Design a protein with these regions (language model features):
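Membrane-embedded segments
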Residues: 1-48
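Solvent-exposed coil/turn segments that connect beta secondary-structure elements
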Residues: 2-3, 21, 25, 65-66, ...
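Soluble non-cytosolic domains of exported or imported proteins
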Residues: 10, 30-37, 123-131, 147
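Sec-exported extracytoplasmic/periplasmic mature domains
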Residues: 21, 25, 44-52, 138-141, ...
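A short acidic, often aromatic-flanked loop/helix-cap motif at beta-alpha or helix-coil junctions
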Residues: 34, 96-97, 150-155
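VWA/integrin I-like adhesion module and closely mimicked acidic/polar interface patches used
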Residues: 59, 66-132
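Extended, hydrophilic extramembrane loops/domains of integral membrane proteins
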Residues: 130-164
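C-terminal signal-anchor/stop-transfer transmembrane helix together with its immediate cytosolic
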Residues: 165-177
Length: 177
């Protein structure tokens, strides 16, 4: 598995939403387990370049279930922290786990993803690992929010907006993505 930058740095919030809507899981034929470690270098480099290109704040939302299934241990995300002005780690899933689905490129319908590491194949299950997610949040000095109880997200976003808003000469606020 590897990490790829799928969109350039932007302050266009509609573009950011469109990119998020276009994300999809790795084709199960090529999947080799999951690990957040593959994202560290790409993320750190992108955050560094973002800080060099703007006078505004660099905000990160790291969205994951936190699960590592490829036998690795979680590495430190501290290398990214010096480039982060705000954000949050958003954790999704439950400790009981849930079946994983992906949209079929043939039918457009959601299909159950299978765990190909066993025979007969079983449904692939996503299980939240809050210890990993909290560790990433601590490393980047941002808040961890379990999205099963998302009551803190509005407060966090409003705080980020207050702390990262920038005004142009004509008084317009910009810089949210």
């Amino acid at each position: 598995n590897n990490a790829n930058l799928v969109a350039p740095f932007t302050n266009n919030s509609q573009y950011a939403e469109d990119v998020i809507d276009s994300l999809y899981p790795l084709e199960q034929l090529y999947a080799e387990g999951t690990s957040m470690n593959v994202s560290i270098d790409v993320m750190t480099d992108t955050l560094k370049r973002a800080g060099e290109k703007t006078d505004g704040s660099v905000v990160v939302f790291f969205i994951s279930d936190g699960e590592i299934t490829n036998e690795e241990n979680l590495k430190s995300f501290k290398s990214a922290a010096k480039y982060v002005d705000g954000g949050a780690v958003l954790g999704y899933g439950t400790t009981e786990g849930g079946n994983m689905y992906m949209k079929s490129s043939y039918t457009g319908q959601d299909e159950l993803i299978e765990d190909t590491s066993s025979y007969p194949r079983k449904p692939a299950v996503s299980v939240i690992d809050e210890d990993n997610l909290k560790s990433i949040a601590d490393d980047m000095d941002v808040k961890y929010i379990n999205m099963n109880d998302a009551s803190n997200i509005d407060t966090t976003i409003n705080k980020i907006k207050r702390e990262s808003a920038s005004e142009s000469k004509d008084g317009k606020v910009s810089g949210y993505a």
